[in-house]
């Protein structure tokens, strides 16, 4: 019993008798408010604990030889789809000219609304032309390429075949009205119909994981003496408006929290024949999710430069939108991790202890202030 008596001397929380405890309305109010605040702070701390934190690390990138996927969604409000070509090339010498297999073009009217097939038929009906039916021709025919025949292309049964044969020869496609295939397909008329339209280009490119560029430019592209050129003879340089809106551009898949700096970028060309260049630095990124899933993608930074691509008015060059990218030799690894449970417990204890302490101080202040005021009131009554 003597030992228990000595132990009681270390009690930091001495108790008072129930008869000496005073309960007040002010104390009840402070208790309820502090309890609600404590609950809100606890829920906030719990929500923070349930989220994951991301730890970044930096490594040398050794993953060469892979393919790089470029996701594209760009609108050109004043450049018809029939005039626009998309090309990609890299420092290894690989070229993709007038890419079509994974990229799609959608015609837009002057208000930016997609042109439906019903609208196309309506436009054709307005000028009362006979729609060309390719099934009406002999499937075994072999038509002329107008001197552009090669070992790969011996027959040109459509206007596009003739254009491709000309492109491979490095010839300019000057006057389609002199070519029977283009005349019967109404090539010139289609070009005229789309003159005031815009174009949306969307899809993806797969390129080698080396430095390179891809661009959107008017005219049919081809190689001539190992030089990449575009046939602009059917355009007036004063009519090329490269105003564009980059809805989305990314290199690889998106991961939580990624920021693509070119998304929703709207650029208005101040004059005709503008050349816009985007210099992009691609940083390979590995994102490891907390469940073990590994996502290999890329981040990038960008700088824009623009100039007039008209030899008479400015520097030499080609009107269009060019994205020139190079890859960083470093790789960023982002790892998701659960937050520390001990940190959560520490936070909860701090919330509870802090609220109890502050609530006790406020309650004591209210109680003693009320007693002091009541004493003065009672003293005034007696006098």
From Swiss-Prot:
UniProt keyword annotation of Transcription regulation present: no
Q: Which residues are glycosylated?
A: 266
Main localization category: endoplasmic reticulum
Q: How does it sit in the membrane?
A: Multi-pass membrane protein
Q: Which residues form the signal peptide?
A: none
Taken from the record's topology, the Lumenal segments are 47-341
Location comes to: Endoplasmic reticulum-Golgi intermediate compartment membrane; Golgi apparatus, cis-Golgi network membrane; Endoplasmic reticulum membrane
Q: What is this protein called?
A: Endoplasmic reticulum-Golgi intermediate compartment protein 3
Species the sequence originates in: Mus musculus
Q: What is the lineage of its organism?
A: Eukaryota, Metazoa, Chordata, Craniata, Vertebrata
Q: Which gene encodes it?
A: Ergic3
């Amino acid at each position: 019993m003597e030992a228990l008596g000595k132990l009681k001397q270390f009690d930091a929380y001495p108790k008072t008798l129930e008869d000496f405890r005073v309960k007040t309305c002010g104390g009840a109010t402070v208790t309820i408010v502090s309890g609600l605040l404590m609950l809100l702070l606890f829920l906030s701390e719990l929500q923070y604990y349930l989220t994951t934190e991301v730890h970044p690390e930096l490594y040398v990138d050794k993953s060469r030889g892979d393919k790089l996927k470029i996701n594209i969604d760009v609108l050109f409000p004043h450049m018809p789809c029939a005039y626009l070509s998309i090309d990609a090339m890299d420092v290894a010498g690989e070229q993709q000219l007038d890419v079509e297999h994974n990229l799609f073009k959608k015609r837009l009217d002057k208000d930016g609304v997609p042109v439906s097939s019903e609208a196309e038929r309506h436009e054709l009906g307005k000028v009362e032309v006979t729609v060309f039916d390719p099934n009406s021709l002999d499937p075994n025919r072999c038509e002329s390429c107008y001197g552009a025949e090669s070992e790969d292309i011996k027959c040109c049964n459509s206007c596009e075949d003739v254009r491709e044969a000309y492109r491979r020869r490095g010839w300019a496609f000057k006057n389609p009205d002199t070519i029977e295939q283009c005349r019967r397909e109404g090539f010139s008329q289609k070009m005229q119909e789309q003159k005031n339209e815009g174009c949306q280009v969307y899809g993806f490119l797969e390129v080698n994981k080396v430095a390179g560029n891809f661009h959107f430019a008017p005219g049919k592209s081809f190689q001539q003496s190992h030089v990449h050129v575009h046939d602009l003879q059917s355009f007036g340089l004063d009519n090329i408006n490269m105003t564009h809106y980059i809805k989305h551009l990314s290199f690889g898949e998106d991961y939580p929290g990624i920021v693509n700096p070119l998304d929703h970028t709207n650029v208005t060309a101040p004059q005709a024949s503008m050349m816009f260049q985007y210099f992009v630095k691609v940083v390979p990124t590995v994102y490891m999710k907390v469940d073990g899933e590994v996502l290999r993608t890329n981040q990038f930074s960008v700088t824009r430069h623009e100039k007039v691509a008209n030899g008479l008015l400015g520097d030499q060059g080609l009107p269009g939108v060019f994205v020139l990218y190079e890859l960083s030799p470093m790789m960023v690894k982002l790892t998701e991790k659960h937050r520390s449970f001990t940190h959560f417990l520490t936070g909860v204890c701090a919330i509870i202890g802090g609220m109890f302490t502050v609530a006790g101080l406020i309650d004591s202040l209210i109680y003693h202030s009320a007693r002091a005021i009541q004493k003065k009131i009672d003293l005034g009554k007696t006098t």
